Amino acid sequence: MHIFDELKERGLIFQTTDEEALRKALEEGQVSYYTGYDPTADSLHLGHLVAILTSRRLQLAGHKPYALVGGATGLIGDPSFKDAERSLQTKDTVDGWVKSIQGQLSRFLDFENGENKAVMVNNYDWFGSISFIDFLRDIGKYFTVNYMMSKESVKKRIETGISYTEFAYQIMQGYDFFVLNQDHNVTLQIGGSDQWGNMTAGTELLRRKADKTGHVITVPLITDATGKKFGKSEGNAVWLNPEKTSPYEMYQFWMNVMDADAVRFLKIFTFLSLDEIEDIRKQFEAAPHERLAQKVLAREVVTLVHGEEAYKEALNITEQLFAGNIKNLSVKELKQGLRGVPNYQVQADENNNIVELLVSSGIVNSKRQAREDVQNGAIYVNGDRIQELDYVLSDADKLENELTVIRRGKKKYFVLTY
């Protein structure tokens, strides 16, 4: 299958410039293309993965990727469809984020092998040395204010106010495309659908300043079956950095995907063939309660982002916590699996009687409730049911001398640390 058709079949093309010309270019030989990543945090998140994996698919088809990290544009801030002005960051902060993001991209693109190995670029390399006068004379003169204000991303901000700093952002992104075309013969840009206005500013600059044709592919902004923006868990972004979102948390995110989204997400976020995904779809629809599509999705994406060992660890944590086998997990695994649950620091001189601890830690509101829970068998210490009111936690209950896991009922976990 032609790479363009495969991208379409997987639901990865939202909008393009001249589709016929782009398809022809991809058929006739190697195309150099780029995707830009502005450092707005110290990590990329799942929302970025759609463009990253689209870039990887094109590389696997023989085309040459350039990964542009916006050391300059990250200092300015993209206004596209944002309700308010971004806070400006210091150069040191942005530089640190650039390095983090460059490291993450190397997991997905091949920067080492073949004539189409990926190339990392930073737009601070050309913007850092250009003077304001040169910027206005050599770039700004090709953009009319009418053209710039016609962009939907700008229109939405006119009423609330937009600074000249952010207004000029589209010119900067347009110039990125121009520089990469002149220096590396890059003719295609890939980005999110919210970037269409900025990306076509690049094709316009290429046409007017160099009489060349540039192409654009936008990938869709992914939403779930309810229309909710994809890539957040409990309102928080799902990060690619394991220190910010653990492999276990990412695994759980994919396992909780709705049935209506699971097969579609397999096409977007995995490298399984379309035939393999069709087989999974048939099995999944025959027995949706077995959640085959979610299991495969979680396995493939966690392995892709964090590696096979991290996936196996996340799966083991899931299985042991479900079975209540707390003692089968290391403290490191428990910290990953129980991140975000209520945590209570036990003082050295504290009364370690189970009833007293349940109240002092805030697990229950009263001694009466604590006694009822214990007597009714609703309290577990490290997976073991405790029904004695006079039970006192000992050193044996301190896993690796660091923590104790309390469970109340079937699912409510609490961690005591020492």
UniProtKB/Swiss-Prot annotation:
Catalyzes the attachment of tyrosine to tRNA(Tyr) in a two-step reaction: tyrosine is first activated by ATP to form Tyr-AMP and then transferred to the acceptor end of tRNA(Tyr). Its EC number is 6.1.1.1. Residues 352-418 form the S4 RNA-binding domain. GO terms for molecular function: ATP binding; RNA binding; tyrosine-tRNA ligase activity. It comes from the Bacteria. Belongs to the class-I aminoacyl-tRNA synthetase family. TyrS type 1 subfamily. This is Tyrosine--tRNA ligase. The gene is tyrS. Homodimer. It is an enzyme of class 6 (ligase). It is found in: Cytoplasm. L-tyrosine binds at Y34, Y169, Q173. GO terms for cellular component: cytosol. SUPFAM superfamilies: Alpha-L RNA-binding motif, Nucleotidylyl transferase. Keywords: Aminoacyl-tRNA synthetase, ATP-binding, Cytoplasm, Ligase, Nucleotide-binding, Protein biosynthesis, RNA-binding. InterPro entries: aa-tRNA-synth_I_CS, aa-tRNA-synth_Ic, Rossmann-like_a/b/a_fold, S4_RNA-bd, S4_RNA-bd_sf, SYY-like_C, Tyr-tRNA-ligase, Tyr-tRNA-ligase_bac-type. Pfam families: SYY_C-terminal, tRNA-synt_1b. ATP binds at K232. A motif ('HIGH' region) lies at residues 39-48. It catalyses: tRNA(Tyr) + L-tyrosine + ATP = L-tyrosyl-tRNA(Tyr) + AMP + diphosphate + H(+). GO terms for biological process: tRNA aminoacylation; tyrosyl-tRNA aminoacylation.
